[in-house]
């Protein structure tokens, strides 16, 4: 009996010891908002500040950390943007310690330096929203948000400013949830300084209609929402960056803004002739390819937001852009033709000049809690000028296997002609001009009918576009395999002047209604009628019988047309002139079911689209006045399952019916260009495309582990492909649209990022992409041969891996990218490709307490697997930047940048399709140095804010402040012209 009692006592003591694990717990809240704060770093330290254990607060602000033994400890709590706090605690008798609520106050914004001790996590995921913490990405001094976006996991930024997040193109930029420069993502990327940004959110935003009705219209847009740092959204902010460099490079930028509770006004100016490339350091996206051509641009933009909470929202933006381009390119192509190939080379010089104005307004009024009125007008005006000149040639054999000379040089052409490889050669010149005016508007009124989800919406849209364009084209061609009666190679020329006025307008009315069937279940109905009209009336004047010469300059029409003054009408070619008029009547009828549950949302439905079209066409002596009636069907399904606030699964399906254009259906042959003849096909069927997407993400608090994966699949039945008939004698081709089956593609991606340690000092990020494309097309070798179905299968693997270390004054990273492409061609197995492109290298950011900052990156980029040995190259691209802050608070920064110090960056690209392989090389200035002078003046409102302003991304503790980022640019095109 005594043994039993003793055993029970020992068991109870053991259970008590297990129950009391010296667990320290609590909840972190914001002093001002009283809301829980997630992602707060909690560190348990010994009395001598030695690290013991750590944790991160969850989405409810809760945390727990276990003490290894009884004793006295320090509990350090820190988060970017908040004052750090240290609690002295004591654990005794192995008891747990409940801290209760721990309140954090916002960090005072110091111009002399923000006191930040924790290393912020790089990315978190909340359902289908990616939240990037800008302070975790250290960008060079003077940089704008483009440099920040390039460093984000899953992000891609192309040379033209196109942004992709997890494979989806970003269509809109928001600042603090408000629209910014509507319709223009580039202005934000090139002008917003990184140092005012606290967080970036990436998510799919529903359309204006979907937001108020809940009806999924398939018009979602991927957006980036830049959150401004606390304390910087009240007062004045300004940043001026003036940069000049060698090789006549310049890059200048100015930005100013005024913020208060309800108003936000921002003004930008930018001028550069560096393609606004920014600093080339850091990030795993480095590799082959500099800027394509020489480009100069100037921009002035303004954006204004006003908001009266729950009552009124007003956004407007105005933008002026001017650009000059000088693009020289050398192109080499192989065109797959049946069991053989044709080859072509070209040398092209293009000059361009563009001028545009754009204005947008978004006005939203909520007169009461049941009504929402939205009005969106916009207007734009633009002109563009172009000059072009090119030399090209076609061959029936690979020219590089016959001659070592340039295949476009006189010596090379003579050698190829003697070998019987020449098919044709051409010299072309052209001048173009266009003037485009556009105005559009949208009015939407939504009314809730009770509180159960019943609502009705009426919407009208209208658009008007007027365009005038002119062009002169001169072409001289030589056919080496077609002989004249005298036994010489055939030649011909075309000299034409085109005037093309066009007009387009449309209007639409839409009614939507949502009816609650039972709890959280809705039946939604939408009807939309659209009328669209377009007219084009091209007048073509043919001077092919005469030699035309003139001044090859912008709008230099008169110098070419003066010899024909007063008699221009006599040269109008009625056959080559083309008139077209198009009227389209469309009815969209959509029915959807919507289920809303605590764990999942489900939408499914179908849209039926009856369409009637009237087409009038006069061309090549043919007059057509035809009417077509078709019906398109588009089923859709969208399912979202919410595992938690940090984990989300989404499945999306959409089917789309597409009709061939009426011009494709007309049985007309267009032989205005003898080397490029096109035909219509009245037997074309509509195509049906099915798109499937699966998306999953999860975020684990422990070590900030983030996981994202998605799979996209697309297939098209009765896809429309051009059947190409190649003429071996002339090198010309005849194209005719045909239906074909077998076009499909699948792609998948996996992203993983984590902090290796609890303090976020060591980090790992990886992106994996796999894609497979099955391209099909028709090919035939001559007019007598039956067309053959050609299939090109392409497999792509892309990998990006980044490993980094960061502390208060230093960040080191090792980045690597891998691109593998395996392409097979059914009819041309000799053209199969297994190519590798990989890039890797270190980057460093170092900041000293006295305001000196050093950035350096080295990228080793390699190509392997190309049949042309000259393509299998290695490039060492080294960029560096040194900056120093001056004056009290460091408002002035002097910065020196060095681009491509080793002068090895190339401008080569390759494109592959079912019918061809094309390699292109561009002109560019990639290697230069630039000196920047940056000054900022910031006056923030509020008691704490008046003390100063926070550091930029990657803030370091106790360092005296650094200025905001910037840069200006522009330049006059130079280069060659034929």
Q: Model segments located where?
A:
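Short, ordered, surface-exposed loop/turn motifs in non-cytosolic proteins
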Residues: 32-46, 125
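Short, acidic Ser/Thr/Gly-rich low-complexity loop/linker segments typical of extracellular
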Residues: 47-62
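Extracellular/periplasm-exposed beta-strand and loop segments of Gram-negative cell-envelope proteins
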Residues: 280, 288-294, 327-335, 342-358, ...
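Face-selective signature of the C-terminal outer-membrane beta-barrel domain
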Residues: 317-319, 358-384, 423-616, 704-716, ...
């Amino acid at each position: 009996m005594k043994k039993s009692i003793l055993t029970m006592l020992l068991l109870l003591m053991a259970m008590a010891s297990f129950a009391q694990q010296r667990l320290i717990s609590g909840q972190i809240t914001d002093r001002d908002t009283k809301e829980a704060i997630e992602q707060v770093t909690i560190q348990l330290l010994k009395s001598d500040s030695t690290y013991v254990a750590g944790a991160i607060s969850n989405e409810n602000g809760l945390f727990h950390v276990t003490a290894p033994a009884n004793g006295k400890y320090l509990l350090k709590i820190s988060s970017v943007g908040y004052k750090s706090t240290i609690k002295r605690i004591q654990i005794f008798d192995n008891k747990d310690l409940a801290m209760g609520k721990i309140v954090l106050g916002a960090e005072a914004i110091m111009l002399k330096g923000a006191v930040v001790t924790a290393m912020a996590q790089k990315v978190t995921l909340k359902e289908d929203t990616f939240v990037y913490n800008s302070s975790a990405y250290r960008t060079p001094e003077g940089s704008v948000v483009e440099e920040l976006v390039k460093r984000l996991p899953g992000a891609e930024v192309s040379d033209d400013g196109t942004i992709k997040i997890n494979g989806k193109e970003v269509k809109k930029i928001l600042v603090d949830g408000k629209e910014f420069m509507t319709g223009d993502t580039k202005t934000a990327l090139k002008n917003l300084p990184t140092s005012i940004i606290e967080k970036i959110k990436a998510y799919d935003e529903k359309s204006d209609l979907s937001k108020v009705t809940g009806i999924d219209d398939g018009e979602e847009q991927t957006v980036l929402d830049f959150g401004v740092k606390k304390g910087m959204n009240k007062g004045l902010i300004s940043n001026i960056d003036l940069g000049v460099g060698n090789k006549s490079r310049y890059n200048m930028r100015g930005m100013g803004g005024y913020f208060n509770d309800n108003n936000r006004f921002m003004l930008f100016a930018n001028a550069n002739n560096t393609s606004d490339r920014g600093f080339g350091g850091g990030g795993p996206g480095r590799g082959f390819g500099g800027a394509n051509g020489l480009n100069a641009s100037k921009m002035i933009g303004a954006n204004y937001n006003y908001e009266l909470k729950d009552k009124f929202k007003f956004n407007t933006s105005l933008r002026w852009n001017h650009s000059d381009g000088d693009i020289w390119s050398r192109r080499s192509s192989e065109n797959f033709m049946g069991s053989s190939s044709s080859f072509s080379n070209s040398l092209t010089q293009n000059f361009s000049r563009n001028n545009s104005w754009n204005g947008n307004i978004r006005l939203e009024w909520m007169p009461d809690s049941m009504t929402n009125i939205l009005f969106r007008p916009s207007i734009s005006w633009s002109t563009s000028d172009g000059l072009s000149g090119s030399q090209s040639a076609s061959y029936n054999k690979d020219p590089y296997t016959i001659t070592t000379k340039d295949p476009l040089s006189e010596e090379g052409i003579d050698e190829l002609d003697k070998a019987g490889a020449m098919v044709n050669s051409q010299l072309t010149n052209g001048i173009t001009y266009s003037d485009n005016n556009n105005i559009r508007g949208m009015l939407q009124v939504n009314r809730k009918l009770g509180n159960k989800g019943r609502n009705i919406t009426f919407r009208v849209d209208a658009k008007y576009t007027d365009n005038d364009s002119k062009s002169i084209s001169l072409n001289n061609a030589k056919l080496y395999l077609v002989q004249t009666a005298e036994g010489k190679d055939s030649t011909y020329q075309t000299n034409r002047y085109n005037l093309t006025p066009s007009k387009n307008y449309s209007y639409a009315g839409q009614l939507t209604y949502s009816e609650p069937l039972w709890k959280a279940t809705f039946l939604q109905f939408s009807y939309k009628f659209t009328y669209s009209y377009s007219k084009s009336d091209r007048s073509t004047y043919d001077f092919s019988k005469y030699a035309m010469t003139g001044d090859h300059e912008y709008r230099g029409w008169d110098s070419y047309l003066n010899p024909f003054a007063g008699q221009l009408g006599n040269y109008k070619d009625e056959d080559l002139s083309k008139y077209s008029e198009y009227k389209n009547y469309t009815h969209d009828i959509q029915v959807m079911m919507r289920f809303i549950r605590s764990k999942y949302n489900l939408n499914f439905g179908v849209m039926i689209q009856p369409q009637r079209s009237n087409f009038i066409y006069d061309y090549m002596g043919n007059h057509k006045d035809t009417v077509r009636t078709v019906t398109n069907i588009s089923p859709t399904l969208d399912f979202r399952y919410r595992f938690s606030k940090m984990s989300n699964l989404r499945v999306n399906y959409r089917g789309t019916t597409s009709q061939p254009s009426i011009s494709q259906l007309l049985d007309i042959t267009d032989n205005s260009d003898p080397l490029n003849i096109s035909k219509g096909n009245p037997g074309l069927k509509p195509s049906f495309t099915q798109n499937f997407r699966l998306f999953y993400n999860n975020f684990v608090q422990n070590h900030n582990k983030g996981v994202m994966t998605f799979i996209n699949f697309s297939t098209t039945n009765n896809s429309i492909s051009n059947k190409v008939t190649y003429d071996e004698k002339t090198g010309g081709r005849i194209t005719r649209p045909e239906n074909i089956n077998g076009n499909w593609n699948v792609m998948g991606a996996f992203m993983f990022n984590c902090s290796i340690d609890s303090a976020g000092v060591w980090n790992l990020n990886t992106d994996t992409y796999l894609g497979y494309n099955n391209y099909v097309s028709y090919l035939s070798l001559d007019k007598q041969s039956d067309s053959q179905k050609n299939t090109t299968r392409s497999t792509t693997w892309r990998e990006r891996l980044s490993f980094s270390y960061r502390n208060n004054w230093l960040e080191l990273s090792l980045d690597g990218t891998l691109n593998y492409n395996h392409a097979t061609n059914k009819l041309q197995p000799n053209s199969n490709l297994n190519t590798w492109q990989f890039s890797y290298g270190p980057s460093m950011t170092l900041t000293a307490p006295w305001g000196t900052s050093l950035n350096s990156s080295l990228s080793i980029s390699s190509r392997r697997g190309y049949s042309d040995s000259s393509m299998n190259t290695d490039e060492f691209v080294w960029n560096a930047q040194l900056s120093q802050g001056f004056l009290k608070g460091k408002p002035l920064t002097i910065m020196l940048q060095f681009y491509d110090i080793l002068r090895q960056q190339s401008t080569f690209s390759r494109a592959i399709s079912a019918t061809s392989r094309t390699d292109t090389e561009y002109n560019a200035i990639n290697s230069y140095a630039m000196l920047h002078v940056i000054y900022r003046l910031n006056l923030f409102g509020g008691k704490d804010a008046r003390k100063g302003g926070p550091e930029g991304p990657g803030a370091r503790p106790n360092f005296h402040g650094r200025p905001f980022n910037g840069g200006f640019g522009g330049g006059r095109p130079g280069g060659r012209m034929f």
